[in-house]
Amino acid sequence: MLKHGNLEYEIIIGCEIHCQLLTKTKAFCSCENRYGGIPNTRVCPCCLGLPGALPRVSKEYVEFGIKAGHALGCRINNFSKFDRKHYFYPDLVKGYQITQFYTPLCEEGEVEVNLAAQNEEPKFKKIRIERIHLEEDVGKSLHIEGSHSYIDFNRSGVPLIEIVSKPDMSTPDEAAKYMQTIREILKFIGVTDGNMEEGALRCDANVNLKIIDNGVEFRTPISEIKNMNSFKAVKDACTYEVSRQLEEYNSKDRIAFKTGFKRTMGWDEPSGQTVVQRTKTIAEDYRFMPEPDLRALELSDKFIKEVSDSVGELPEAKRLRFKKEYHLSEFDVQTLTSERELAEWFEEAAKKSSSPKKCANWILAEVLAILNETNSSLSDLKFGPEAIAELVNVIEEGKITSKQAKDVFAEMIACGKKPSAVIAEKGMEQVSDSSFIEKIVEEVFAENAEAVQDWKNGKTNVAGWLMGQVMKKSGGKANPKQAADLVNKRLTE
């Protein structure tokens, strides 16, 4: 229990996440499903709600819903159906939204949310998922300065899933990390791009408190904070709403606390406050009714299994395997499995390398740094994972030093050449011929007899200087380890 003055309280948060899916077409028509474009150009009679236009379900839409349900640990129902949700708003052109109210596609899931800070050992909390249902997005209202508003119906009919959690989150940070986990999983399996700036992932958070006041339990009314499109917004809005409800309780203004009272709030980021949009004392009547123009979804066990199996290895399973198989740290695996492309890129390099750990180090320290610096992606690189594996291998074989490897990597970035080609062109390859190195060591010792005597008189730092002279005389080609061993051997003779 948390403390606020003389009160003890618990925070209760549940989330409803709306996620746009990356299907080729819209949910119930053949219009292109792509963000943006000239307003009202990716539309047809169906998504404009014209009389007589009949919807038809996209098979890919259903498949993506199954994939999401499988990835989030849900039971996929063999039977589900569509319903109409009626309300009146300018961007809802039909006057109703096609959704799944009574029988959703997916139910009873759960996700493990890692609550630990970066570089800490994982600390997981299980968040239950009540349901995932299919529904269509609505148009986009554009409020221009002046007396007019415009509506872009390109977004009307875009396929969504709504993921409804149980009220299992007990801090604003948990709510933000839950949303982050959902985004990571759904991006990883390829059903969404998760671009929150474009509205591909939006969160409604239901927040209230259980307060113990002098031994008596009291629950504040639920506030539903709508349409948050960033992790920071979720955390900040829930944090503010908790403090607002505590202050309201302490004000003893209990008129607003009557049974069934509920507020719909918006998050005003500039002011850092939640703002009341509407209040209601009874459940909102959306006049749900079965969608008469769409058949129920009747899915065979075989079809559900085939679609579920196509998802492949999920991020958490991949993390555990990477730690065990490649002996990587928690930080390494968290980063490498943050996106499927990165995980597959690393694994392809690891399988061709003598040191998967060093491959991981190069990818995390050098490759990702370049991508961040240039705001590019792995697909933009002029070389593939096999080149990183080759670079690590030549370092491990002693053909070049780690310092030389940085120069080779720079050439790979600029030209896309193989490490072996860069090494050959620049004459970088180290010489491991012991007779060649011994000859150079003898020459250095003969030319620097005074320095050798200084070492014998106790100036041990001279050994490093002599080593530098050997490397200089060899043009940087002498194998450093062999050279160091021979210098030390010669000094102790």
From Swiss-Prot:
GO MF: asparaginyl-tRNA synthase (glutamine-hydrolyzing) activity; ATP binding; glutaminyl-tRNA synthase (glutamine-hydrolyzing) activity
Region (Disordered): 473-493
Source organism, top-level taxon: Bacteria
Extent of the signal sequence: none
Protein keywords: ATP-binding, Ligase, Nucleotide-binding, Protein biosynthesis
GO BP annotations, alphabetical order: translation
InterPro entries membership: Asn/Gln-tRNA_amidoTrfase_suB/E, Asn/Gln-tRNA_Trfase_suB/E_cat, Asn/Gln_amidotransferase, Asn/Gln_tRNA_amidoTrase-B-like, GatB, GatB_C_1, GatB_Yqey_C_2, Gln-tRNA_amidoTrfase_suB_CS
Reactions catalysed: L-glutamyl-tRNA(Gln) + L-glutamine + ATP + H2O = L-glutaminyl-tRNA(Gln) + L-glutamate + ADP + phosphate + H(+); L-aspartyl-tRNA(Asn) + L-glutamine + ATP + H2O = L-asparaginyl-tRNA(Asn) + L-glutamate + ADP + phosphate + 2 H(+)
EC number in record: 6.3.5.-
SMART domains, A to Z: GatB_Yqey
UniProt record similarity statement: Belongs to the GatB/GatE family. GatB subfamily.
Function: Allows the formation of correctly charged Asn-tRNA(Asn) or Gln-tRNA(Gln) through the transamidation of misacylated Asp-tRNA(Asn) or Glu-tRNA(Gln) in organisms which lack either or both of asparaginyl-tRNA or glutaminyl-tRNA synthetases. The reaction takes place in the presence of glutamine and ATP through an activated phospho-Asp-tRNA(Asn) or phospho-Glu-tRNA(Gln).
Subunit structure comment from the entry: Heterotrimer of A, B and C subunits.
Name of this chain's protein: Aspartyl/glutamyl-tRNA(Asn/Gln) amidotransferase subunit B
The species this protein was found in: Treponema denticola (strain ATCC 35405 / DSM 14222 / CIP 103919 / JCM 8153 / KCTC 15104)
Gene field: gatB
